[in-house]
A protein has these predicted regions:
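A glycine-rich, hydrophobic/aromatic-adjacent loop/helix-cap motif
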Residues: 2-183
Length: 183
């Protein structure tokens, strides 16, 4: 994997499929997967995204949930580690608006050189999901779920099964179309 001083990203959900699913299988100790953050689909944020219902074309007043990490002693999350440049990290920081980039080098099994980063839910992203759960309007986008499952399927049926068994959640899945908004 790259020499000392090289930055890496640990993907545990949709980032597994980025870069064609290339990277090294690894495990992040002390965490588990949850549906932990959300975006407020009522707000239109330039340069971000919104969702439309495929069946009607309408924009539902929902909070769209995404996979997050939750600290959990004795647990571990499988994923993919790949090297990234500083420019790639900056681009990921812009893209992963519901998350904060955190260093997890000492908690990763499978990479022995360089720094390893991952994205853990931001306070704001977690608060949005809490509001959506309280209002009964937190949902999962079918496309997002299928992208995550496809990423793990590319790593092998056992990896997909491990993902399915590891994610904790109870939210409904809606057929939503993602619309990227201009900046």
């Amino acid at each position: 994997m790259g020499g000392l001083g090289t930055d890496h990203i640990f993907g545990y959900a949709s980032l597994v499929l980025d870069d064609g699913g290339r990277g090294t299988l690894a495990r992040l100790r002390g965490h588990r997967r949850v549906w932990g953050v959300a975006t407020d689909n009522v707000r239109a944020i330039p340069g971000y995204k919104m969702y439309l219902e495929r069946s009607s074309g309408s924009r539902p007043a929902v909070y769209v949930a995404f996979v997050d990490l939750e600290r959990r002693e004795g647990s571990a999350v499988g994923g993919l580690v790949r090297p990234v440049s500083e420019a790639q990290l900056e681009e990921l920081d812009r893209r992963e608006r519901n998350y904060d980039r955190v260093e997890v080098t000492g908690q990763i099994e499978g990479v022995d050189q360089g720094r390893v980063w991952t994205y853990r839910g931001s306070t704001e992203g977690r608060e949005r999901l809490r509001k959506g759960r309280e209002a009964g309007t937190a949902v999962i986008s079918r496309d997002y779920l299928e992208k995550v499952l496809a990423g793990f399927e590319r790593l092998g049926a056992d990896q997909r099964r491990a993902f399915e068994e590891s994610v904790v959640g109870d939210l409904p899945v809606l057929d939503l179309e993602r619309i990227d908004l201009p900046a």
